[in-house]
């Protein structure tokens, strides 16, 4: 418990006090956000706002995790390291995307093909490694079974280990891409994606702590309600650091934002959420916990699909938050109300998680 608190506190302090230093660094070098011409006109005033703030979020997370392990005199575990690898790897892809936008002063960053290849390499590496490193109980960080609140029994390795590995890599990469894009689409208003991330990752602190206390590896009497998650305490430490890092960053990212997280932060946080859902065996529960992200993605999919079929639009602009902007809602009002919706999704997800344990 102490290590989790230390991790969150260090992540918060590093982000809170490190972000203004990073802002000065970016302003000095004139690394500012380029605003799309086809976006809401109110956003033109944000042109030049420093971006790539995800660098601070990632750094604060790594430092929080490291200091917590040192203070608790514990060794990092493979699950936590895999989660950090996925977060940092996707953050690097996002950083390259942001840097190209800034250096070339355009809204298009990294070439789509190279972006997909980069995400694919990181995703495949994570997926393959997640099925390695069995512990004394022969549990690997991830499972080839599709999961809801725990493994469901739907095993992707139904036709053998080789087929299972291939299908798992495809499934995991789908989740990684989906969640990364979801957070990226949500990052359209000051503080929106950051605030929602605080709620969502806080839920996963609760989930991982509960899994740690009810782990099949620590309970004297193993029953059907215990969890077979590998290294849940280590995942809780990483997740607490992410919560602290996002909370500290939100101080500077809230309206009017002094800095944006950019693709650096959005891809990193999306990757971390995907990784957590895989490593905690909560792949479909994450859809509920991260429900606001899902709603944002669906609004974009509906808009594009409906327009292609009818040449008409469902929303004034997609994603959904831009629709409300063009409807005359104040940006802060939209953000706060979306935070409330995100909190309701999180409460529902955590409630379902706990109810399953009680019933099970």
UniProtKB/Swiss-Prot annotation:
<keyword id="KW-0808">Transferase</keyword>
<feature type="transmembrane region" description="Helical">
    <location>
        <begin position="235"/>
        <end position="255"/>
    </location>
</feature>
<dbReference type="GO" id="GO:0008360">
    <property type="term" value="P:regulation of cell shape"/>
</dbReference>
<keyword id="KW-0961">Cell wall biogenesis/degradation</keyword>
<feature type="transmembrane region" description="Helical">
    <location>
        <begin position="189"/>
        <end position="209"/>
    </location>
</feature>
<dbReference type="GO" id="GO:0005886">
    <property type="term" value="C:plasma membrane"/>
</dbReference>
<dbReference type="GO" id="GO:0009252">
    <property type="term" value="P:peptidoglycan biosynthetic process"/>
</dbReference>
<dbReference type="GO" id="GO:0046872">
    <property type="term" value="F:metal ion binding"/>
</dbReference>
<dbReference type="InterPro" id="IPR018480">
    <property type="entry name" value="PNAcMuramoyl-5peptid_Trfase_CS"/>
</dbReference>
<feature type="transmembrane region" description="Helical">
    <location>
        <begin position="52"/>
        <end position="72"/>
    </location>
</feature>
<feature type="transmembrane region" description="Helical">
    <location>
        <begin position="156"/>
        <end position="176"/>
    </location>
</feature>
<feature type="transmembrane region" description="Helical">
    <location>
        <begin position="80"/>
        <end position="100"/>
    </location>
</feature>
<dbReference type="InterPro" id="IPR003524">
    <property type="entry name" value="PNAcMuramoyl-5peptid_Trfase"/>
</dbReference>
<comment type="similarity">
    <text>Belongs to the glycosyltransferase 4 family. MraY subfamily.</text>
</comment>
<dbReference type="Pfam" id="PF10555">
    <property type="entry name" value="MraY_sig1"/>
</dbReference>
<feature type="transmembrane region" description="Helical">
    <location>
        <begin position="284"/>
        <end position="304"/>
    </location>
</feature>
<keyword id="KW-0573">Peptidoglycan synthesis</keyword>
<keyword id="KW-0133">Cell shape</keyword>
<keyword id="KW-0131">Cell cycle</keyword>
<feature type="transmembrane region" description="Helical">
    <location>
        <begin position="338"/>
        <end position="358"/>
    </location>
</feature>
<keyword id="KW-0132">Cell division</keyword>
<dbReference type="GO" id="GO:0051301">
    <property type="term" value="P:cell division"/>
</dbReference>
<feature type="transmembrane region" description="Helical">
    <location>
        <begin position="114"/>
        <end position="134"/>
    </location>
</feature>
<keyword id="KW-0479">Metal-binding</keyword>
<comment type="pathway">
    <text>Cell wall biogenesis; peptidoglycan biosynthesis.</text>
</comment>
<dbReference type="InterPro" id="IPR000715">
    <property type="entry name" value="Glycosyl_transferase_4"/>
</dbReference>
<keyword id="KW-0812">Transmembrane</keyword>
<keyword id="KW-1003">Cell membrane</keyword>
<comment type="function">
    <text>Catalyzes the initial step of the lipid cycle reactions in the biosynthesis of the cell wall peptidoglycan: transfers peptidoglycan precursor phospho-MurNAc-pentapeptide from UDP-MurNAc-pentapeptide onto the lipid carrier undecaprenyl phosphate, yielding undecaprenyl-pyrophosphoryl-MurNAc-pentapeptide, known as lipid I.</text>
</comment>
<feature type="transmembrane region" description="Helical">
    <location>
        <begin position="259"/>
        <end position="279"/>
    </location>
</feature>
<dbReference type="Pfam" id="PF00953">
    <property type="entry name" value="Glycos_transf_4"/>
</dbReference>
<keyword id="KW-1133">Transmembrane helix</keyword>
<dbReference type="GO" id="GO:0051992">
    <property type="term" value="F:UDP-N-acetylmuramoyl-L-alanyl-D-glutamyl-meso-2,6-diaminopimelyl-D-alanyl-D-alanine:undecaprenyl-phosphate transferase activity"/>
</dbReference>
<dbReference type="GO" id="GO:0008963">
    <property type="term" value="F:phospho-N-acetylmuramoyl-pentapeptide-transferase activity"/>
</dbReference>
<dbReference type="GO" id="GO:0071555">
    <property type="term" value="P:cell wall organization"/>
</dbReference>
<feature type="transmembrane region" description="Helical">
    <location>
        <begin position="2"/>
        <end position="22"/>
    </location>
</feature>
<keyword id="KW-0472">Membrane</keyword>
<protein>
    <recommendedName>
        <fullName>Phospho-N-acetylmuramoyl-pentapeptide-transferase</fullName>
        <ecNumber>2.7.8.13</ecNumber>
    </recommendedName>
</protein>
<keyword id="KW-0460">Magnesium</keyword>
